[in-house]
Amino acid sequence: MESEQRRKRKRIYKPDSTSNSFFSVRSLTACLSFFVFLLFISSDRSPIKTVSFRPVLNVPVSLLPTPLGLTRDSFDTKSLPLIVEDRVLLPDHVLLIVSNKVATSQNLDCVYSNLYNSHDVVLKPALSVNQYHRDKSIVRCQLPPNNYSAAVYLRWSWEAAEGVAAAAPASVVSWDRVVYEAMLDWNTVAVFVKGLNLRPHKESDSSKFRCHFGLSKFDKDEGIVFTTEAITAAQEVIRCLLPRSIRNNPVKAQGIRVTVSRINAGEDGVDAPLPSVAKVYGAKSYEKRSNRGKYELCACTMLWNQASFLHEWITYHAWLGVQRWFIYDNNSDDGIQEVVDELNLQNYNVTRHSWPWIKAQEAGFSHCALRARSECKWLGFFDVDEFFYLPRHRGQDMLGENSLRTLVANYSDSSTYAEIRTICHSFGPSGLTSAPSQGVTVGYTCRLQAPERHKSIVRPELLDTTLLNVVHHFKLKEGYRYLNVPESTAVVNHYKYQVWDTFKAKFFRRVSTYVANWQEDQNQGSKDRAPGLGTVAIEPPDWRLRFCEVWDTGLKDFVLANFADTASGYLPWERSPF
């Protein structure tokens, strides 16, 4: 009898031995991972990267074999597994970060699991796919149906339905509270954070923050390997020192995940680290041009669905002397990559950077300033509906090519000025009801009399380490100041109030962190809004006649004189009817 009871007790406790074995294996795996991580950062040979090692062999391309007809360009990325690293729940879609390149959203499905029955799934086509951080991709999926999880995963439409519900449980983080980007900056890292709710346009106390580095997602503090102090904090950017063990060789930080925690007056004094989808990356441009001369003048902009304006904006400003372009694309779906490719074929130096984070323009400009610093002496921040104009002086001919570059180059060695500011004139629809075929510079010629705001061109290496900015101008290093350029020397034509079909897109979403969306009943007196409009995109009957106080054809005349084809009269960005 007693022996029978002992056998039963053994059977009852058998699962516990399995559980103990599981935790032992888990602990062993964690220890081995930690050991490998330490080995990587202590080695002088093996920086952590997301790309594999490729030894350099100088062999003529024509002599290289191509087994099975595969090349880098012809390789079918659809044959690679769809490994989702992170998921972020945004207000209007779910963002997935995929560990490899995905060429197209065609035949790519987002898979949603029922919250109460994992075998009940719904498939919806992916909204879009973009390259992200070199060899990764971002995939956008629709919001989940009611009672379905936002922890979306992916599959190709031709894959067998069997096993779709067998995916492991996955996590999803909210856009309201997440570390979303991190950029290496010498022996520090600039960490971009949503949810700290720091004061806008002001520096905050950095002593209240810490950065944590590791290989995992920091679930329950399990992934933290190193912790360092923050040295600056402003708006959505926390700058921290790199861990001491890799400070002398910052490249080893590439690919390490980072998060931020806040020190408070709570019970334990420290908040839990924020969820993070951010891994440390360096500026790709720094690797390319660290030993070469810098461009004199570059431009950075953030846009959404404005590909149709790019050709005119870039062609015109390239003539004025802009040499390098950084386009931060905020979830466009209007074929912008094709436009960028076409411009590069015409020898314009344009890079499109996917910036999927909504309401994060200031952070995006801080990111761009870091990225461009090693390439550019001067960096202009202005929108694709804003055009610099250098009016001719009385008794003088029109200024020639590269005139804007020449203007800023006069101050490249200044020990005083690190920013050049120009005022803006806001133009209205100018009586038009449809978009002008010759572009905005020729089509819109009536504006408000009083100037508004200003736009800036800065020296990136002389920006304050906080990277604090108010959309179009930055806090400068101590000892430097800005220069206001007289209106007679340079001005920006801002084609702000265009024909209604173009203008109404502004109601969808404003990109600035600290500017309310126009559908919201907030700050209706703000200069960001159009006077007289409410919160609904309804065209006023007299829209085409509004914002017209001064007829100004200065830039129109300049463009027609310098850009129009002498035979046909067509402008370079104008679509020929033939």
Curated annotation (Swiss-Prot):
- InterPro entries xrefs: Glyco_transf_92
For this UniProt entry, the molecular function terms from Gene Ontology, in alphabetical order, are: glycosyltransferase activity
Kindly state one GO CC term assigned in the UniProt record. cytoplasm
Membrane-spanning intervals of the chain: 21-43
Query: Its membrane topology, per UniProt?
Result: Single-pass membrane protein
List GO BP terms, alphabetically.
glycosylation
- Protein name in UniProt: Glycosyltransferase family 92 protein RCOM_0530710
Species lineage: Eukaryota, Viridiplantae, Streptophyta, Embryophyta, Tracheophyta
